[in-house]
Amino acid sequence: MASNAARVVATAKDFDKVGLGIIGYYLQLYAVELILSEEDRSQEMTALATELLDTIEAFKKEIGGESEAEDSDKSLHVMNTLIHDQEKAKIYMLNFTMSLYNEKLKQLKDGPWDVMLKRSLWCCIDLFSCILHLWKENISETSTNSLQKRIKYCKIYLSKLAKGEIGSSDEKTLDYADFADDSEEIKDEDVDHQTSDLENNNNDKVEGLAPKDQTTSYEPVDEVPEFIDDADSVNEEEQTVDKNEDAITKDEQQVVKKEVDLTRPSAPSEPAAAEHKSYTKDELTKIMDRASKIEQIQKLAKYAISALNYEDLPTAKDELTKALDLLNSI
């Protein structure tokens, strides 16, 4: 779980760097909930969650304040809308993630089969998992199954890439036709329908932010892009997921080690979109406030012990009094 959260944080920072702060915003929210759902989280991860909450609040205030200015850019108004309108935010995240996923399917066929392809597939896994977690109450069962299926496909592709089964001149290359499913429509009809309804029923459309690719910003995507599904020989492929877990784990460790040095990666677990409890903003604040107070109490106790070592009784008494006051406030 810790390695998953660390990877999500690294991905969020990448999106911030390329001007897609709203994607990073929701990935950070997802990372906080991943960390808080871990009962045995380390102090480092607790501190990371606190830092993320501060970053999230600062981003909301910055966007909210700038969007209210008379000469503010239209994109700021859009981002402010995406922060406060969860239905529009869900559609935007779905639209972006499916665009990225579809682009990576084409790259799996044509190449290059480089480290960025692997990183992008992990990015798709994190984005799909984020959507399932943050909006699980507002996503149909059909869409949920569809997104979970694509997470499995991404893991299968990562395993094949790690073992050299895709893009290697000495091994069997990917036959793109193997993953075309004639039984399904090319487009994801459920999400396409949601997007159309949203645009028809709201005068203030969500536009101007959906990128054509991961590195460009503020280009509109009018509809969910064409989606090439991958379901021929699904049973055979899905049975290989568990067998290929070691190869996937090794690949993830290489990616996380390059991106962030927060914790040692462990074998990735299945995205827990429906397993984690969702917290309200007030609940998150209370949890982090309690953790912060406990950490402060520990520091004050250390100061008191240090003062006692030097027989500085007044300072020791003062520090212990502060610690006791904080303890009583919990």
Curated annotation (Swiss-Prot):
The modification Phosphoserine is found at S183, S233. This is Vacuolar protein sorting-associated protein VTA1. Has a role in the formation of the multivesicular body (MVB). Required for the sorting of lipids to form intralumenal vesicles and for fluid-phase transport to the vacuole. Required for sorting the plasma membrane proteins STE2 and STE3 into the MVB. Acts a cofactor of VSP4, promotes the oligomerization of VPS4 and stimulates its ATPase activity by 6- to 8-fold. Changing E311A: Abolishes interaction with VSP4 and dimerization. PANTHER family: VACUOLAR PROTEIN SORTING-ASSOCIATED PROTEIN VTA1 HOMOLOG (PTHR46009:SF1). Residues 187-217, 233-280 are annotated as: Disordered. InterPro entries: Vta1-like, Vta1/CALS_N, Vta1/CALS_N_sf, Vta1_C. Residues 190-207, 240-262 have a biased composition (Basic and acidic residues). The modification Phosphothreonine is found at T195. Residues 1-167 are annotated as: Interaction with DID2. It is found in: Cytoplasm; Endosome membrane. Residues 290-330 are annotated as: Interaction with VSP4. It holds the Pfam family Vta1_C. The keyword Transport applies. Residues 37-68 are annotated as: Interaction with VSP60. Present with 4400 molecules/cell in log phase SD medium. Residues 280-330 are annotated as: Dimerization. It comes from the Eukaryota. One of its GO terms (cellular component) is multivesicular body. It comes from Saccharomyces cerevisiae (strain ATCC 204508 / S288c). It is a peripheral membrane protein. GO terms for biological process: late endosome to vacuole transport; late endosome to vacuole transport via multivesicular body sorting pathway; lipid transport; protein transport. Changing L327E: Abolishes dimerization. GO terms for molecular function: ATPase activator activity; protein-macromolecule adaptor activity. Belongs to the VTA1 family. Keywords: Cytoplasm, Endosome, Lipid transport, Membrane, Phosphoprotein, Protein transport, Transport. Homodimer (in cytoplasm). Interacts with VPS4; the interaction requires the dimeric structure of VTA1; 6 homodimers of VTA1 appear to associate with the dodecameric VSP4 complex; the interaction is ADP-dependent. Interacts with SNF7; the interaction requires DID2. Interacts with DID2. Interacts with VPS60; the interaction occurs at he endosomal membrane.
